[in-house]
């Protein structure tokens, strides 16, 4: 079973950019209600896709330096990375089915 990694400005490069496979990053904040709705969906995805992707969450208030690099303007923002490349982006709360479709379209 895969758990969600807590990402920080300090560990982002090691955990995401240097990772050899796909990493789904959720940019979020504690005050964001759509982020709270998305949280349990991400937990399920982390378990169901444990052999395909790594899932991480980056709190943009506690870690203010990383989000501007990727032009994060709205949250929740989901970015799918492969190495240093952003393959796809999805902004806003989405259903589990929409998230699975997003991943299946981009993980090949």
UniProtKB/Swiss-Prot annotation:
Name the GO cellular-component terms: cytosol
Q: Domain named Thioredoxin: which ranges?
A: 2-108
**Which GO molecular function entries does the Swiss-Prot or TrEMBL record give?**
protein-disulfide reductase activity
Q: Which keywords does UniProt give here?
A: Disulfide bond, Electron transport, Redox-active center, Transport
Keyword Transport in the entry? The reply is yes
Pfam families, alphabetized: Thioredoxin
Q: Which domain of life is it from?
A: Bacteria
Which GO biological process annotations does it have?
A: cell redox homeostasis
Q: Which family does it belong to?
A: Belongs to the thioredoxin family.
Q: What functional role does this protein have?
A: Participates in various redox reactions through the reversible oxidation of its active center dithiol to a disulfide and catalyzes dithiol-disulfide exchange reactions.
What name does the UniProt record give this protein?
Thioredoxin
This protein's species is: Buchnera aphidicola subsp. Schizaphis graminum (strain Sg)
Q: Tell me the gene name.
A: trxA
């Amino acid at each position: 079973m895969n758990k969600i990694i807590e990402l920080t400005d300090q560990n982002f490069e090691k955990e995401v950019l240097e990772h050899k496979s796909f990493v789904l990053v959720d940019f979020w904040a504690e005050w964001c209600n759509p982020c709270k709705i998305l949280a349990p969906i991400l937990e399920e995805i982390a378990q169901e896709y444990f052999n395909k992707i790594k899932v991480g969450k980056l709190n943009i208030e506690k870690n203010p330096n990383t989000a501007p690099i990727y032009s994060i303007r709205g949250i929740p923002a989901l970015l799918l990375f492969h190495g240093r490349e952003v393959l796809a982006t999805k902004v806003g709360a989405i259903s589990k089915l929409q998230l699975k479709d997003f991943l299946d379209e981009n993980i090949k």
